[in-house]
Design a protein with these regions (language model features):
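Helix-loop boundary and gating motifs at the non-cytosolic
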Residues: 2-54, 196-241
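Hydrophobic core of transmembrane alpha-helices in multi-pass small-molecule transporters
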Residues: 17, 96-113, 206, 286-301
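Conserved MFS/SLC helix-loop-helix module at the cytosolic interface between two early adjacent transmembrane helices
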Residues: 57-93
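Helix-to-loop junctions at the C-terminal end of transmembrane segments
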Residues: 57-71, 156, 247-261
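Structural signature of the two symmetry-related core transmembrane helices
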Residues: 73-88, 166-169, 263-278
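Cytoplasmic helix-loop-helix junction between adjacent transmembrane helices
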Residues: 104-141
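Symmetry-related core transmembrane helices of the 12-TM Major Facilitator Superfamily/SLC fold
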Residues: 163-181
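C-terminal transmembrane helical hairpin of 12-TM major facilitator-type secondary transporters
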Residues: 263-300
Length: 301
């Protein structure tokens, strides 16, 4: 269990576990709640697209903040800005000013958080234990992803959006606390050769962004509609997927640390391709539940 000896990574994983509880209990309901709140299906996709455009436009500010402050303060700021989106989400009723505010805040929060979080985790982690540290994080994420959707679905059904998303915002805010005890990481003023070295990563991110629209956002909406727009049933389906993902993540991490990263990646893309095609053929509730659970396996890979 040497991979658990890095205190900084453990604190970061604790933060990410709390963050993931907010994501699975609130963020996973983002698109489907918009649909339920009177935003038409085409406009839901337009809202998601607007957030992505905002993220693209705001991304250069990461370098400004990162160079001035280091990574940790930017991750903390991103965590707090992300928390602000949930109360806004609860106020949306169709195409209104709250939807516009939601798109702006979500774009800012996601830009601040995700770019710096991944860099921060990579900087604090140990190269020789990378696979185990990532798989331990993902196992924790999968575990809270079992509880989060159940609580989110129950809260939206029985307490209403204000209370449910308010609770999610509180959890997201508290997720910043472990970061206060984590070390800061400075950003180099210049990085010669960085663009050339990142070409493959750039290509992977482009393809990842392309498939995410249908594989994640589109599927969430399809699943929600197949489940007759029930927040409780939708949350239960996500919880089932969390169980599968928790078991699959640990196996993958072991393969990576044994030097089989390329094999794991090949297997991941093969499973992903087959699974994506199967999703397009989904027409019944049992089939949707099974494929959604298997999707956690593909996601872990």
């Amino acid at each position: 269990m040497a991979f658990l000896g890095n205190k900084s990574v453990n604190l970061l994983n604790l933060h990410y576990g709390m963050h993931s509880l907010a994501v699975s209990g609130g963020g996973a309901f983002f698109a489907v709640y918009l649909l339920k709140a009177g935003v038409s299906l085409p406009l839901v996709f337009c809202a998601i697209a607007a957030i992505m455009v905002g993220r693209f436009c705001l991304r250069p500010m990461i370098l400004i903040f990162g160079k001035a402050w280091g990574l940790r303060p930017v991750v903390i700021l991103g965590t707090l800005v992300q928390a602000m989106q949930y109360p806004l989400l609860a106020q949306v009723h169709g195409l209104d000013i709250w939807l516009l505010a939601l798109c702006l805040v979500s774009a800012a929060g996601d830009t601040l958080y995700w770019t710096t979080y991944h860099a921060y985790f990579a900087a604090l982690g140990d190269a020789e234990h990378r696979g185990h540290q990532v798989s331990a994080r993902e196992a924790l994420v999968s575990a809270v992803s079992i509880v989060g959707p159940i609580l989110g679905g129950w809260g939206l059904t029985h307490l209403g959006p204000l209370a449910a998303f308010g609770g999610v915002a509180l959890v997201q805010t508290l997720a910043a606390l472990p970061l206060l005890a984590s070390p800061n990481v400075a950003i180099a003023r210049t990085a010669p050769g960085a663009i050339r070295a990142s070409r493959m990563g750039f290509a992977i991110c482009v393809t990842d962004g392309w498939v995410s629209a249908g594989y994640y956002v589109g599927w969430q909406l399809v699943l929600f509609l197949i489940l007759k727009e029930s927040f409780t049933a939708y949350g239960g389906a996500l919880a089932l997927a969390g169980i599968v993902g928790a078991m699959a993540g640990l196996v993958l991490g072991k393969l990576v640390d044994l030097g089989h990263g390329a094999k794991a990646a090949t297997l991941a893309f093969a499973v992903f391709a087959v699974y994506t095609i199967a999703r397009g053929l989904t027409v019944t509730v049992p089939m949707a539940l099974i494929l959604n659970a298997l999707g956690a396996l593909a996601g872990s890979l």
